[in-house]
Amino acid sequence: MRREAGTWAIVILSIMSMCVLLSRSTRGMPMFARKYGVPCSTCHTSAPRLNETGYRFRAAGFRMPEEIGSASEEAFDILDYLSARVQFRTGATRSKVGRLTTTNHQTLVQALELYPFTGAWGGHFSSDIKITFFPVSSPPAAIENLYGKFNTGSQRRFFSARAGFFHPYDGYGAADGPATISRPLFQTTPANSNQSTFFQSWGFDEGGAEIGFDAGHTSIRAAVLSGLVINKEGEKFSATAGVLAKPSAGPTYGAPDFQIFVNHVLQPEGGGLAFHYYHGNLALPIAGTSNFFRNDFDRAAIYASYPLNQHLQLFGAYQYGRDHTSSHAAFSSAGTFVEAAVPVKRMTSAGLRFDWFDPARPKAGNEINGVTAYVNAWFFSQLRIVAEYQHKRTKREPLPMQTDDAFQLRVIYIK
């Protein structure tokens, strides 16, 4: 086991060092880079993480805030609204439960992502479309974004409204997309007292409508969302949402979900505060019967981040959740993460994140904790390499603890 751990460490350090040494300056999302002729660092700290310029560019409908209400004087070019990205993945995992150890090695095409007709149209309207194909996954395709947006106002204060299907929220700093592959555990793990509640604060792209207001360094968003539906294949239940949601196996209550998201920029290179609140409802199966019960649930999270200096940026967050069991008893869940990231070169960073999540606070011995080390490197204009190692421990009392180790390397090319 020590020899395996040493081999893993050598491989990880070698790949991370190679990524850092090869990294070069790069350009941004190609369709926006082509349109504005700017480098990627104009909008990103370590992509996909945004700085304040990039965040406001997205909030203003893929235009600079001062361009709201002004039609572009440049000739229309369809290539300014089209991009594509392909992801390759290789990795190895090892899982240990008691004395049983299993390993897996895999190399594959992870995803093909298309961004057709994404950008600003005139001075007020914009659209965002993202279609992802998964060659070896089920379902084989997902429509992650498919919405139209309207902005009006001035550079300092503007309103927005969008409708369609979109990612759960647009965060900044600690609430933004991570610079590594995996997200914090509390964003991607459902609460679970005696059964899964299925909802995750990230991972389901729902349909809905959202209104927003940006003033200075603060933005507020309120959304009404379609929520999730429970599906059943054989004896297994799952949840889907969005454009390609499957037919519901249980009742639908006709009550939409509701979300509020607030961002405040403290520092232009990723320092900020964010608050997220989500209220939803979902029909969950009652074990041993063909019946369902309604789970009214809530999630509330606060995020904070700040660059202490040019060589260290800190991120952290805490989320609290409340759900119900089939006996209508309420239970809570909670999770947190802290992360330290070190900028190595422009657009290239290395980091370490600690995660903790308790899917049911009243229940003893079921916590999950993990440590994730990563390097996020960009080079040769549009090529990104992400190397990640994660060690995770899951308590399952009275069963033995489960320990998972995973190394993953992503090679991502965007055009």
Regions found by a protein language model. Name each.
Residues A75-Y81, T90-A111, A239, V243-S248, ...:
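Surface-exposed strand-loop-strand hairpins of Gram-negative outer-membrane beta-barrel proteins
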Residues Y253-A255, I260-A360:
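Detector for outer-membrane/organellar transmembrane beta-barrel domains
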Residues Q87-G91, T132-F134, F166-P168, A223-G227, ...:
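Outer-membrane beta-barrel pore domains and translocons
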